[in-house]
UniProtKB/Swiss-Prot annotation:
GO terms for molecular function: rRNA binding; structural constituent of ribosome; tRNA binding. Binds directly to 23S rRNA. The L1 stalk is quite mobile in the ribosome, and is involved in E site tRNA release. Protein L1 is also a translational repressor protein, it controls the translation of the L11 operon by binding to its mRNA. GO terms for biological process: regulation of translation; translation. This is Large ribosomal subunit protein uL1. Gene3D superfamilies: 3.30.190.20, 3.40.50.790. PROSITE patterns: RIBOSOMAL_L1 (PS01199). Keywords: Repressor, Ribonucleoprotein, Ribosomal protein, RNA-binding, rRNA-binding, Translation regulation, tRNA-binding. The keyword Protein biosynthesis does not apply. InterPro entries: Ribosom_uL1_bac-type, Ribosomal_uL1, Ribosomal_uL1-like, Ribosomal_uL1/biogenesis, Ribosomal_uL1_3-a/b-sand, Ribosomal_uL1_CS. HAMAP family: Ribosomal_uL1_B. Part of the 50S ribosomal subunit.
Amino acid sequence: MAKNKRLTAAQATVERNKPYGLSEAVALVKSNAKAKFDETIEISLNLGIDPRHADQMVRGLISLPNGTGKTLRVGVFARGPKAEEALAAGAEVVGAEDLAEKIQAGEIDFDRCIATPDMMALVGRLGKILGPRGLMPNPRLGTVTMDVKGAITAAKSGQVEYRAEKAGIIHAGVGKASFDEAKLVENINALVDAVQKARPTGAKGTYLKKAALSSTMGPGVRVDVASFEA
């Protein structure tokens, strides 16, 4: 009941169909993040694309200027010296066939998956498990690489993966409620800029149609797309 009352009270502070300027939206979302834990601030971007078409996919990685406030657990497929490099760089899970067996058994104890190129024949067999979870290593995202240390460091330093879902919507965490408003605004503008630059050639008409911000337990707040920094 307390949660429902808190959400109802928070919703009363937000005009449902009003698009707010970015700074005002961030302030509203922060003020309504009153849970006992540090809530994640998430942005939703509604894009004018149809991801079912290969030429309208939007996906990428960006290192947010102020990090995400979340420590990612990293899994790495590698052997020999590269496996040792991964462990030294702070990867939580490192392996080859043994790691594949754990994943097939449902043990997926990581948020980002990295692989050296020679491991992709093995990793490819896990596509039906890793793909739907957004964990499949991808050379275009820098997660299939011989620079294992660099990829792990980037993942742990506030790197965010964004990917448009079937409806053309991107959901991404941009920080924590404890962040200063200015840092959240900077992170959001950086993410939106990356998404804008990733506009696919097949996209027609208005690309960035709608945007909204919310905290883990708070109501959504519409954001005026014109208020993002170009």
